[in-house]
Amino acid sequence: MPRLKLTLEYEGTRYVGWQVQPNGPSIQSVLESGLERLLGARVSVASAGRTDAGVHASGQVACFDSPRVLPMKAYVMGLNGLLPPDVAVVDAVEVAEDFDPRRWSRGKRYRYRVSNRRTRSPLRRMTHWEVFAPLDVEAMRQAAAHLLGRHDFSAFRAADCQAKHAVREIRSLAVEGTSGDAVSFVVEGTAFLKHMVRNLAGTLVEVGKGRRPASWVAEVLASQERKRAGPTAPPQGLVLEEVFYRDGPPARTPGGTTDAEEDEG
């Protein structure tokens, strides 16, 4: 039974998130339903990350064991013909039988988008956080520099985050765009805590609005207290852009876990 790795793109507005839940449609549920129709049997799908309600993806990764052997094109084109228009398979490849989309990950890249023009945008309302005030891009870049590296990000985790610890590594955090139009925070890290990127975005916007100096972000990080950071940015601005992989499962220290196994992003 071959194991297939799917790369997915979806517009998450009408979904309760990745994971199957009783209160509405999820990305996982519509994907598993489409696969059942395509393959004639029920399959279970695992993902690289559990995106929240309203969050989008251009590079989510999922995998499943296929009860039938089909050409790769059939998995892509056939499944896309069965999925709703806001979910699509971009690519399908066969992988090792022990491939795990979360555990084998060596990192992810997210983009958080903010519309900072003074008037609302009908075209951005489902894909950006609209703040209606020009943001200081340079100040936010200075603030973002304090977040690079490996730190305890307790100040940026959700209250109900289940991760055993809050130590994570941010490899890069770029602030792109233009004051008075649209700005993006592009963050790449080994793993993420629940709501971590949205909390980082909310904190950087506080600096961009001039409410706090760039140095305040370093103080928030050192405090390890969620109440010291900015608000949680809304979900519609967040996109999971890419999941990065190694050639095989990551090495583990005796009795320890890898960053990927602790990932809640």
Curated annotation (Swiss-Prot):
Q: Which domain of life is it from?
A: Bacteria
- Where on this chain does substrate bind? 110
Top-rank EC class of the record's enzyme? isomerase
Q: What is its EC number?
A: 5.4.99.12
Task: Report any one BP term from Gene Ontology.
Answer: tRNA pseudouridine synthesis
Q: Which UniProt key words apply to this protein?
A: Isomerase, tRNA processing
The active site consists of 52 (nucleophile)
**One MF annotation (Gene Ontology) recorded for this entry:** RNA binding
Query: Which region ranges are annotated with the description Disordered?
Result: 244-265
Catalyzes what?
uridine(38/39/40) in tRNA = pseudouridine(38/39/40) in tRNA
Family annotation (SUPFAM superfamilies): Pseudouridine synthase
Q: Which HAMAP family does this chain map to?
A: TruA
By sequence similarity, the record places it as follows: Belongs to the tRNA pseudouridine synthase TruA family.
- Its job: Formation of pseudouridine at positions 38, 39 and 40 in the anticodon stem and loop of transfer RNAs.
The record ties this protein, via PANTHER family, to: PSEUDOURIDYLATE SYNTHASE, TRNA PSEUDOURIDINE SYNTHASE-LIKE 1
Subunit description:
Homodimer.
Q: What is this protein called?
A: tRNA pseudouridine synthase A
